[in-house]
Amino acid sequence: MEIELLSKARPSGLRAPGRARSKSSINNKRSYATLQGITGNKSATRRLCSIVALALAVAACRGETGNADSASADMVQLAAGKKSKTIRPAPAPDPAPAPAPAVDTSSSSLEGAAPIASNFDPAIELAATSIPPSAAPDVVGAFRFICLPGQIKSDDPIVYPGQPGRSHLHQFFGNDTADANSTYASLRGAGNSSCMSPVNRSAYWIPAILNGKGSVVRPDYVTIYYKRRPLSDPIVSDPAHPQYQGKGIKLPNGLKFIFGRDMLNLSQPQTGAISFSCDGPTAVPQSSYKNFEEAQAGCAVGNRIGARISAPDCWDGKNLDSPDHRSHVAYGGYGGWGYYKCPTTHPYVIPAFTMGVWFTQAQGEVYSFVSDSMDTSAGHKRGDTFHADFFMAWDPAVHDMWEKNCIDKMLNCSAGDLGNGKQIKQTWPHSWTASPRLVAIPS
């Protein structure tokens, strides 16, 4: 698996030389692959080894080409140059908003909700860096960053808006004010972010991970990897192209959805190309498992278990939400026509992301998602109910940067690199190991 020795130290905000480039492979089965490698300077490596040992992470890629590129490069760069960043307090939060309606009204624009500027200067959250390399021979632009675990709440602003404590327990990432009352306006108006910086006030959440001993396991980190073909690519711009996928557009403001196992309708097939992996000093290379039970059986104590899931890449162009919180987005497919494309009901191609949730396996623990207890179907396994929620609330200017540069110029951007000589600063307190690792299940 992806175990990379930290290479060269660098000044704060600058990228380490030798950044891994993405590699391409065609996979019509949409399977995961992780192809990477970083060769570091040996003397610099020895110096860094006294501070950190190994940085590891996997960001598996799901898409029309089966492209793969790990977010381990993010951690190499952050560990080499983000240690001494000044941590600034979040802007003062706005008053608690009124409960949101269950479903948003339709969007009148392909850009989604009207953009809401940050209540701080986003320029102070950016650092100078070099321009990243092209992602070629890959066919998608890549934008990656690392998130750290945030709040743990029995809230779900998508399924149970305005109803605190109504949902099963969730582990949140991103905006640290996200709760049952969150709306696009409230997320944009307040909060720090465990996804590097408050320029990304989006909220991401998954069912909490339990250890079988009455505690919640907090992830060490989460990798996020956005990707899409550039808008100049005729496959997403020219309807006359023989392999036209759909019209490429930016990620709509305020878009929210759920993907993975449908907890409101467990009879539905699982979505999100879910897989589990093992990474660490004794991990089996390129391991892949179907659930926690298989992963624990094949992953020795002391290694990290990773749960990976990919978001939809097609949108209906009208709705920022839907009654089931899923129908307004969709996954492309190959069908009988032999090439990847979006359904005619969802003709717009949006930047999709793959999320990898990584935590350290300890002796005597038995892992499950809190939602697994809701699945009473015959033969169900621990981990079968993996799903994730997303509520888009990026700073409009910074969002525009990574879309126009990393995605549309088909660059290989890691560690919050925006592809324009700027990089998002790591202002959230950073560590590669969750501390505390375990917390009590809230009463």
Provide a role label for each language-model segment.
Residues 88-100:
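Intrinsically disordered, low-complexity proline-rich regions
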Residues 62-65:
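Bacterial signal peptide processing site
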Residues 79-91:
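Polycationic, low-complexity disordered segments in secreted or periplasmic proteins
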Residues 103-166, 171-309, 316-443:
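Primary mode marks residue(s) on the alpha4-beta5-alpha5 output face of response regulator receiver
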Residues 58-60:
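C-terminal motif of bacterial Sec signal peptides marking the signal peptidase cleavage site
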Residues 29-49:
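Bacterial N-terminal signal peptides that target proteins for export
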Residues 18-24, 45:
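Intrinsically disordered, low-complexity segments enriched in serine/threonine/proline/glycine
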Residues 8-17:
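Intrinsic, low-complexity polybasic segments
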